[in-house]
Amino acid sequence: DVYVETRTVIGPKAKKPLVLDIPIMAGGMAFGLGLSEHVKVAIAKGTAKVGTCTNSGEGPLLPEERAAAKYYILQYSAGTWSKETETLRQADAIEIRLGQGAIAGVGGVIPGENVHGRLAELLNVPEGKQVIIPSKHEELPRSKDLKRLADRFRSVTGGVPIGIKLAPSAWLEADLDLAIR
């Protein structure tokens, strides 16, 4: 038998690196937009048992999911939810969502018929109200504002790792250069 080190460190230079037991993470899948509360909590419990993290996805922070997770990545979306300092401080890492897959710079809509119960409560909107997810972050009018936002997150969280989720263009290196400035 050969020993294989599976421990994975996200943000090794962060004040509070995220140290996972295995190099596998649950991807971002949102409560109420894609998954039910029961599924989100089950994924959080499963990731906790194997020593890895779960990800909020584009939806709001679900307190029951956070309580069940050992490690939690908060996806910071262009929506109006999960932006409070108290919410940010619950994250073991923050992923700034700029795009994904083939939908860079595209917003979204949560139909009113899907906005009820717990989802309406956590989004802080009336039941039945359609929710628009903007195509871009209001606080990021220019690429140089990304550093300011990341610095704010580092400050309020005590230094958790900050990453981005993007759908790169045909000029990947240029996209990455803008992201790391």
Predicted segment positions?
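N-terminal capping/small domains of soluble enzymes
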Residues: 1-134, 145
